[in-house]
């Protein structure tokens, strides 16, 4: 089954680098259709969707906000879909609140979030220390494993 990914560009390559690397590894060998603009979000039925976004130091991403608006204005846009989300930020703030906001919008648009649908990466990746220890890897390896 293919995956539809929505990855709003931040426009700051140095901040997007870590998320891009994780996505490259997580999506390797999978059929994925990746869209980067809000206008590209089209109604879908029963698909697997992934929202992966990078925030700046102020917790902002302009294209993400446009995607969020589109989800909120179209309550059946993701009807019957199953989804997940990855939120990556350069600091220790804003990732959780952004993830909660996006999860609610996805759910209200008809997308089910099943199991452990959220991967939250703070700047230090401190939230991956225990997972890294359990997996015998470093925090980046744990982040990548969680995204898969």
Per-range role (PLM):
Residues 2-37, 43-148:
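FMN-binding flavodoxin-like domain, especially the glycine-rich phosphate-binding loop
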């Amino acid at each position: 089954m293919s995956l539809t990914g929505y990855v709003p560009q931040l426009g700051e390559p140095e901040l997007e680098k870590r998320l891009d690397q994780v996505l490259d590894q997580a999506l390797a060998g999978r059929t994925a259709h990746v869209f980067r603009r809000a206008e590209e979000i089209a109604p879908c039925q029963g698909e697997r969707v992934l929202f992966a976004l990078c925030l700046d130091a102020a917790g902002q991403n302009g294209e993400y906000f446009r995607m969020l608006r589109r989800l909120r204005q179209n309550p059946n846009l993701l009807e019957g879909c199953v989804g997940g989300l990855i939120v990556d930020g350069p600091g220790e703030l804003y990732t959780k609140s952004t993830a909660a906001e996006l999860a609610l919008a996805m759910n209200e648009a008809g997308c089910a979030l099943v199991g452990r649908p959220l991967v939250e990466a703070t700047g230090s990746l401190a939230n991956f220390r225990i997972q890294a220890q359990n997996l015998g890897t470093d925090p980046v390896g744990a982040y990548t494993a969680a995204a898969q």
